[in-house]
């Protein structure tokens, strides 16, 4: 009897001594976390997305996620707190939003309802972390950039596909080395192609002091039908952050022109391309841009307007008239 009691006591003691599981969102009283309130009408490096019906914008600001009407106005916070959460993307039917979050201890892809409720972690990587997710047109899968490193910390990316129920994922692209990045995935509305940016600077490794007016990044297109990849655009000034219009005819992207980062349009039918806005914030082509060379932007459903972040503001541009509209928040 005394032996049985001793074993039971030891089990209770071991159970009591088990440390509590770490929760990024609730680190405990000793963290001395203090919330702060402020009002602003501008933000830094804001990723954004437009809902499929063109009525709502989702954007991130300082690691929190907000939504607001396409006309602007008071933004509604749908994800706040200690976790750093960015890169919201509406699902094709407009009922869900995917985003990158470190709430699970490292950057992974999560999905929530458009009001911020019922947030769920989709990917559960604890080493090869993920960001920049984009939905497939059927709404059943997410494709994201997975980060790989070796002896040098800069690392490189690969494109991986995950079902919205989770799982270990499916590799779509293979990194050519461990230092030149692949990033910024975007899927055509017909689901035939995956566009992404790739560091193709000569040398085969990450370098400082690269010349952005030569070519650092190019935009590649991966075919889901045959698995082949082709270069769509690049050249002097490079090309990054590919964003395809809903009708699949136009590709918006970022190019460096001398000292300016410029928003360009590429006609996917003719190959013609031209600049439409030359006052973007400086892109990160020369840097180690793990979250992308420029923040996410998006097309309006009408195929003639783009909504993007620049100079602290959310702007809308008509690609034909070049008329700019400020969307206040």
Segments the model singles out, each with a brief description of its role:
Residues 1-13:
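Bacterial Sec-dependent N-terminal signal peptides
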Residues 11-16, 20, 41-42, 60-66, ...:
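A flexible loop/linker signature enriched in serine peptidases of the S9 family
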Residues 28-31:
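Short, C-terminally biased terminal segments at protein or domain edges
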Residues 33-66:
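Beta-strand-rich domains and repeat architectures in extracellular enzymes and scaffolds
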Residues 49-55, 88-96, 133-141, 185-193, ...:
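Blade-terminus and WD-like Trp-Asp/Gly-His loop motifs, strongest in beta-propeller folds
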Residues 69:
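Periplasmic/extracellular electron-transfer cofactor-ligation site
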């Amino acid at each position: 009897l005394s032996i049985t009691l001793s074993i039971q006591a030891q089990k209770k003691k071991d159970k009591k001594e088990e440390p509590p599981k770490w929760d990024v969102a609730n680190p405990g009283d000793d963290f001395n976390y203090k919330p702060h309130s402020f009002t602003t009408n501008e933000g830094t490096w804001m990723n954004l997305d437009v809902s499929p019906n063109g009525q709502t914008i989702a954007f991130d600001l300082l690691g929190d996620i907000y939504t607001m009407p396409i006309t602007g106005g008071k933004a509604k916070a749908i994800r706040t707190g200690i976790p750093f959460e960015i890169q919201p993307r509406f699902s094709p039917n407009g009922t869900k939003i995917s985003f990158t979050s470190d709430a699970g201890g490292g950057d992974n892809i999560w999905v929530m309802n458009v009001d911020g409720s019922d947030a769920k972690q989709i990917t559960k990587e604890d080493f090869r972390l993920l960001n920049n997710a984009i939905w497939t047109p059927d709404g059943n899968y997410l494709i994201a950039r997975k980060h790989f490193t070796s002896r040098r910390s800069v690392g490189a990316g690969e494109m991986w596909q995950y079902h919205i129920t989770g799982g270990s994922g499916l590799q779509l692209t293979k990194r050519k080395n461990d230092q030149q990045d692949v990033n910024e995935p975007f899927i055509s509305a017909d689901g035939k192609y995956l566009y992404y940016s790739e560091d193709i600077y000569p040398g085969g490794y990450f370098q400082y002091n690269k010349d952005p007016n030569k070519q650092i990044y190019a935009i590649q297109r991966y075919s889901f039908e045959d698995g082949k990849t082709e270069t769509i655009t690049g050249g002097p000034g490079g090309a990054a952050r590919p964003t395809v219009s809903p009708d699949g005819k136009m590709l918006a992207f970022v190019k460096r022109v001398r000292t300016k980062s410029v928003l360009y349009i590429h006609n996917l039918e003719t190959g013609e391309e031209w600049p439409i806005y030359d006052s973007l914030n400086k892109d990160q082509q020369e840097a180690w841009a793990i979250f992308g060379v420029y923040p996410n932007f998006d097309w309006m459903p009408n195929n003639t307007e783009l909504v993007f972040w620049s100079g602290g503001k959310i702007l809308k541009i008509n690609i034909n008239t070049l008329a700019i509209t400020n969307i206040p928040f």
